């Protein structure tokens, strides 16, 4: 089990050292723009890092939508992201589940997901689908939909990323999320380990620092005890607060 944080891309190694992580997650292009990542100038440095590196794909990507003007650019941006991530040996690229929109065919959304993963297979990069917090037309908010998606894509080079804030906000009890994710995939590939500023089933994606939000501490501790996988904190407050959250996780793993 490796523990780290989502940190800045430009000084990733230095920031990871500061929060005392042995893994980290970065964006390699703007999360809110349709701009493909540029080749990294620090490939050698990243390749020499002694731990897994995760890349979070831009938030704009929605490979499930029936809207061609969004789906096609999403596939291109995902593939370009995978190519650059592969260049420095990233372990996986994390992508939000997306949505089919009002009146969309969710079954078609699952098929679009399969096509998107197939398109990036030649990059060798593993895709991790992340559960999301809100939206009744979302692919990966409700557990039943996540399970149906897995039936369509589970034989490909793909895994699941469990975000604890998102499952809480999406109305999936934490222990149930862990058990059902593991039943699907045998091993959860990655946990985005975040507390929540909001109440259960709020559909609001507002992360909070560990132990300071609304998710009961015993629920968070259950995740650490039962997931046995890499942990990335995506909590607010900058590096100083993330350093505290990384330490929070380490204390509970060693006790």
Range-by-range predicted roles:
Residues 147-164, 168-255:
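Histidine-acidic metal/acid-base catalytic patches
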Residues 38-45, 75-78, 107-114, 141-146, ...:
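Charged helix-capping and loop-helix junction motifs
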Residues 3-7, 24-26, 53-57, 93-95, ...:
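Hydrophobic faces of well-ordered beta-strands that scaffold small-molecule active sites
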């Amino acid at each position: 089990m490796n523990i780290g944080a989502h940190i800045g891309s430009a000084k990733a190694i230095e920031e990871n050292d500061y929060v005392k992580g042995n893994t980290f997650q970065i964006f390699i292009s703007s999360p809110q723009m349709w701009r493909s990542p540029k080749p990294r100038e620090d490939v050698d440095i990243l390749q020499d890092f002694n731990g897994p590196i995760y890349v979070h794909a831009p938030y704009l990507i929605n490979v499930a939508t029936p809207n061609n003007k969004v789906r096609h650019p999403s596939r291109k941006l995902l593939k370009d992201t995978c190519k650059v991530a592969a260049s420095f040996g990233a372990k996986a690229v994390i992508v939000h589940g997306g949505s089919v929109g009002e009146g969309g065919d969710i079954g078609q959304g699952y098929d679009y997901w399969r096509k998107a993963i197939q398109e990036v297979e030649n990059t060798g990069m593993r895709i991790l689908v992340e559960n999301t917090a809100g939206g009744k037309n979302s692919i990966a908010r409700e557990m039943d939909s996540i399970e149906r998606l897995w039936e369509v894509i589970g034989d490909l080079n793909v895994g699941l990323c469990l975000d604890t804030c998102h499952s809480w906000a999406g109305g999936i009890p934490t222990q149930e999320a862990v058990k059902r994710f593991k039943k699907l995939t045998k091993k959860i590939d990655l946990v985005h380990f975040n507390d929540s500023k909001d109440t259960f089933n709020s559909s609001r994606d507002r992360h909070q620092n560990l132990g300071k939000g609304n998710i009961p501490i015993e629920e968070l501790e259950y995740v650490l005890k039962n997931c046995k996988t890499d942990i990335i904190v995506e909590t607010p407050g900058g590096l100083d607060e993330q350093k505290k959250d990384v330490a929070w996780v380490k204390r509970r793993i060693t006790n």
